[in-house]
């Protein structure tokens, strides 16, 4: 879920903290990517038509491998150096949210069965996506693929978003890429949305600057964390009836959740019983992360290993894989040039910040009006 409604809240109240960037503008940049979020997107979109997905001869789904392979090559060809970060053990506080997701997926599975029985194609298309689950095997498959491609993998002790933020805070990477906004709450200095979108969508990358977020909202980092908890996060329920704008107003007025609770109209707003907001706050401020990782290296691809894994084990087209490997090798040579900023003083960016509602609304409408169709044969 991430932080409920945070993108719109920032677009309306902190537009200078957001700017649209071209995909190619991240040439030479090291970017930490939330792997689980990307895999989930690939399973939903790549090669899917209704209940049909890309599979190998054994009937095992390969959509995640197809998506990860192609999307990573696109990053490398643009001179971007991705670091994929995988989730570890979720914190206990997230178990309630995960249980809700499992319940919704079970409900969707039951509804999907009924839709199949009556032949409702629209319902099948919609419900089949709601039943998607990223498994441990999906993660292990992608880790193996990335290592064969010569792309670094980081296994987080807990939340991938928190680990990504820690890598960015400690200058291991330039920015964090995900679709969930949690990384901002964990303090990532720079956060990117839509970096992993397919090129066919033609949606610009949205870059968020956390320092400018705080400046625009006139909040401290502690207050921003409290704001995110009030908006709704993965760790605890929020106060019903308090949306983003009201939460921002209350934080500006009272400064903290404790002070808000002391002054809140209890007849109008129902506070969750035994509300663990303090523990949620602690998880954002003191997440379980590690910087004890091997040096991040982007190496030459293992050509034989890739052909064995993708072609022999998973039924990929050998000619396409061979050509893709050549793209990886060519991209590695290109990215070794590095950014000009390594040699010359950087100039000020010409990227314009978003206007308040107008640009945000136009971007949303443009995205809504375009549907992506993934290619690939069903097997």
From Swiss-Prot:
Query: What EC class does the entry list?
Result: hydrolase
**The protein's required cofactors:** Mg(2+)
Post-translational modifications: Phosphorylated. Phosphorylation upon DNA damage induces relocalization to the nuclear plasma.
- Binding annotation for Mg(2+) 1: 34, 87, 159, 161
Positions bound to DNA: 71, 159, 232, 234
Q: Show the GO MF annotations.
A: 5'-3' exonuclease activity; 5'-flap endonuclease activity; DNA binding; magnesium ion binding
Give any Gene Ontology cellular component: mitochondrion
* Localisation: Nucleus, Nucleolus; Nucleus, Nucleoplasm; Mitochondrion
Compositional bias of kind Basic and acidic residues = 355-364
Q: Which UniProt keywords apply?
A: DNA damage, DNA repair, DNA replication, Endonuclease, Exonuclease, Hydrolase, Magnesium, Metal-binding, Mitochondrion, Nuclease, Nucleus, Phosphoprotein
Residues annotated as binding Mg(2+) 2: 180, 182, 234
Q: Region Disordered: start and end of each range? A: 331-379
One GO biological-process annotation of the entry reads:
base-excision repair
InterPro entries from the UniProt entry: 5-3_exonuclease, 5-3_exonuclease_C_sf, Flap_endonuc, HhH2, PIN-like_dom_sf, XPG-I_dom, XPG/Rad2, XPG_CS
Tell me where on the tree of life, at the top rank, the source sits: Eukaryota
The EC number(s) attached to this protein equal 3.1.-.-
Gene3D superfamilies (alphabetical) = 5' to 3' exonuclease, C-terminal subdomain (1.10.150.20), 5'-nuclease (3.40.50.1010)
Annotated region described as N-domain, given as residue ranges: 1-105
Task performed by this protein? Structure-specific nuclease with 5'-flap endonuclease and 5'-3' exonuclease activities involved in DNA replication and repair. During DNA replication, cleaves the 5'-overhanging flap structure that is generated by displacement synthesis when DNA polymerase encounters the 5'-end of a downstream Okazaki fragment. It enters the flap from the 5'-end and then tracks to cleave the flap base, leaving a nick for ligation. Also involved in the long patch base excision repair (LP-BER) pathway, by cleaving within the apurinic/apyrimidinic (AP) site-terminated flap.
Output this protein's name. Flap endonuclease 1
Report the source organism: Zea mays (Maize)
């Amino acid at each position: 879920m991430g932080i409920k409604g945070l993108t719109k809240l920032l677009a309306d109240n902190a537009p200078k903290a957001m700017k649209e960037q071209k995909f190619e503008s991240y040439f030479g940049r090291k970017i930490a990517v939330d792997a689980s979020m990307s895999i989930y997107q690939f399973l939903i979109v790549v090669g899917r038509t209704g209940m049909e997905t890309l599979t190998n001869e054994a009937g095992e789904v390969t959509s995640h491998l197809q998506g990860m392979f192609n999307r990573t090559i696109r990053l490398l060809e643009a001179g971007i150096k991705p670091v994929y970060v995988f989730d570890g053990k979720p914190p206990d506080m997230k178990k309630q949210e995960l249980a809700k997701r499992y319940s919704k997926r079970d409900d969707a599975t039951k509804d999907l069965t009924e839709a199949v029985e009556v032949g409702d194609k629209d319902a099948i298309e919609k419900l089949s996506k709601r039943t998607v689950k990223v498994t441990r095997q999906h993660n292990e498959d992608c880790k193996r693929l990335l290592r064969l491609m010569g792309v670094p993998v980081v296994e987080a002790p807990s939340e991938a978003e928190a680990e990504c933020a820690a890598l960015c805070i400690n200058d291991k990477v330039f920015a964090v890429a995900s679709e969930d906004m949690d990384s901002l709450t964990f303090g990532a200095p720079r956060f990117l949305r839509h970096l992993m979108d397919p090129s066919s969508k033609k949606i610009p990358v949205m870059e968020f600057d956390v320092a400018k977020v705080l400046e625009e909202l006139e909040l401290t980092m502690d207050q921003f964390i409290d704001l995110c908890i009030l908006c709704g996060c993965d760790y605890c329920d929020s106060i019903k009836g308090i949306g983003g704008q009201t939460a921002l107003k209350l934080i500006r007025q009272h400064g903290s959740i404790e002070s808000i609770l002391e002054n809140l109209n209890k007849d109008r707003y129902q506070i969750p019983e035994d509300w663990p907001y303090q523990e949620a706050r602690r998880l954002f401020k003191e997440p379980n992360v590690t910087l004890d990782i091997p040096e991040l290296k982007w190496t030459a691809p293992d050509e034989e290993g890739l052909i064995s894994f993708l072609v022999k084990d998973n039924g990929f087209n050998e000619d396409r894989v061979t050509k893709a490997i050549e793209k990886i090798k060519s991209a590695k040579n290109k990215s070794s040039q590095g950014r000009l900023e390594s040699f010359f003083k950087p100039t000020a960016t010409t990227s314009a910040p978003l206007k308040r509602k107008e640009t945000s609304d136009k971007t949303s409408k443009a995205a809504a009006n375009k549907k992506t169709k993934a290619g690939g044969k069903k097997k």
